């Protein structure tokens, strides 16, 4: 009988991955979802990007791009100051401008690969830009490129939103990680449809509700780690997997 075992085809960009213990690998494609002022999305972002226990020190200032339509978010100002992000890398959401950033990073990555080097790690943070439909209306736009193809250029993308349903299907299905605060049953139904790999929906719903029961607590979903599901301290949750 013929041996029809599927053999792995090596993608050169696979070597650009940075495996990490207990947190999602880089490059990461993450969604952080929680209600405004009642969750702690900005606090999560500061912890992730400033502390060495997470991603602190893994991105050079000139390779960090902060996209936000909220000029008054003090925590984002702290983030920009602490990371020494250039002013030219801080901007409101604009499809054209973000496309220019993506094209620039992709060109630089291609030059590095041609020279036999790994692309530098880049980070794009898109903070609370979903209320105007920027993360959902253009399914063929730059956000889709970031979540579908950004890994080839070693681009990590983190998007925050108040509702999971505000994200496009492309973003939702291409996430490698998510941090989810408590939400409505309607939102949870959509999350369950996308992110439940357990034996039953009931088990996933129970895990979600238990993980998000306390104020500012959340569920971590990390597809790069065994078991997928983690609590607010990034510790694995016992499941049927």
Residue ranges and their predicted role:
Residues 14, 31, 90, 218, ...:
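Generic preference for hydrophobic/aromatic residues in regular secondary structure cores
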Residues 2, 10-13, 127, 221, ...:
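Intrinsic disorder/low-complexity signal
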Residues 200-240:
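Conserved AAA+ ATPase small/helical "lid" subdomain
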Residues 101, 240-241:
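Short, surface-exposed linear segments at secondary-structure transitions and domain or protein termini
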Residues 16-18, 27-62, 67-79, 88-206:
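Conserved P-loop NTPase motor cores
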Residues 1-19, 71:
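N-terminal pre-Walker A segment at the start of P-loop NTPase domains
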